[in-house]
Amino acid sequence: MSSFTTTNTPPPYLLRKIYHRRVNQPFSVVCCTGEPQQDIFTRRRTLTSLITFTVIGGATSSALAQEKWGTRSFIKEKYFMPGLSPEDAAARIKQTAEGLRDMREMLDHMSWRYVIFYIRLKQAYLSQDLTNAMNILPESRRNDYVQAANELVENMSELDFYVRTPKVYESYLYYEKTLKSIDNVVEFLA
């Protein structure tokens, strides 16, 4: 018999190549000679310990940590202490009014990016603060307060829109309207 008829294995060009794919290599393929092999978990342990010590260090009290409002702690405010007391909410609204007055210089320099960031930061918690601060007011003044608060929210959203475009005249116009409406809200809370 010929060798062509008795072969049990197929020819090499018909064989399917077997690819073994490693998902995670246990060590780096390229390494320098003379240096010890780096443990795979070294970076993870370092990062975990850094985050742990940062959180523990952040738990200590300082002047900024005692302050219950401000731009430095907006992540903490939004996710870890969303519900302030009505007095704290009123104080944060007053501080927002002062911050909006200080924003004039950013508008004069036309640094729109910072203005947008500041407006959106304040808008994020202002509606909740306005609702919380309403509990301080007597029933007879609440309707007027709600109208002033709605006007403030509307003016801030218009200011945000015109700063995004950026239209200079309209931005200044709604900036002044926002200042006027936040002053009306602060009058109710005083």
Curated annotation (Swiss-Prot):
SUPFAM superfamilies noted in UniProt: Oxygen-evolving enhancer protein 3
Transit peptide: 1-31, 32-68
Keywords tagged on the record: Chloroplast, Coiled coil, Membrane, Plastid, Thylakoid, Transit peptide, Transport
Native source species: Arabidopsis thaliana
GO cellular component, as recorded: chloroplast; chloroplast thylakoid; chloroplast thylakoid lumen; chloroplast thylakoid membrane; extrinsic component of membrane; nitrite reductase complex [NAD(P)H]; photosystem II oxygen evolving complex
One GO BP: photosynthetic electron transport chain
PANTHER family in the cross-refs: OXYGEN-EVOLVING ENHANCER PROTEIN 3-1, CHLOROPLASTIC, PHOTOSYNTHETIC NDH SUBUNIT OF LUMENAL LOCATION 2, CHLOROPLASTIC
Pfam families xref list: PsbQ
Molecular-function GO term, any one: electron transporter, transferring electrons within the cyclic electron transport pathway of photosynthesis activity
Subunit text: Part of the chloroplast NDH complex, composed of a mixture of chloroplast and nucleus encoded subunits. Component of the NDH lumenal subcomplex, at least composed of PnsL1, PnsL2, PnsL3, PnsL4 and PnsL5.
Protein name: Photosynthetic NDH subunit of lumenal location 2, chloroplastic
Membrane topology category: Peripheral membrane protein
Subcellular location: Plastid, Chloroplast thylakoid membrane
InterPro entries assigned to the protein according to its UniProt record, in alphabetical order: PsbQ-like_dom_sf (IPR023222), PSII_PsbQ (IPR008797), PSII_PsbQ_pln (IPR054099)
UniProt function note: NDH shuttles electrons from NAD(P)H:plastoquinone, via FMN and iron-sulfur (Fe-S) centers, to quinones in the photosynthetic chain and possibly in a chloroplast respiratory chain. The immediate electron acceptor for the enzyme in this species is believed to be plastoquinone. Couples the redox reaction to proton translocation, and thus conserves the redox energy in a proton gradient. Required for both formation and activity of the chloroplast NAD(P)H dehydrogenase (NDH) complex.
Coiled-coil blocks: 87-107, 139-159
Organism taxonomic ancestry: Eukaryota, Viridiplantae, Streptophyta, Embryophyta, Tracheophyta
Encoding gene, per UniProt annotation: PNSL2
Family, similarity comment: Belongs to the PsbQ family.
Disruption phenotype: Impaired chloroplastic NAD(P)H dehydrogenase (NDH) activity leading to the loss of post-illumination increases in Chl fluorescence, probably due to a reduced stability of the NDH complex.
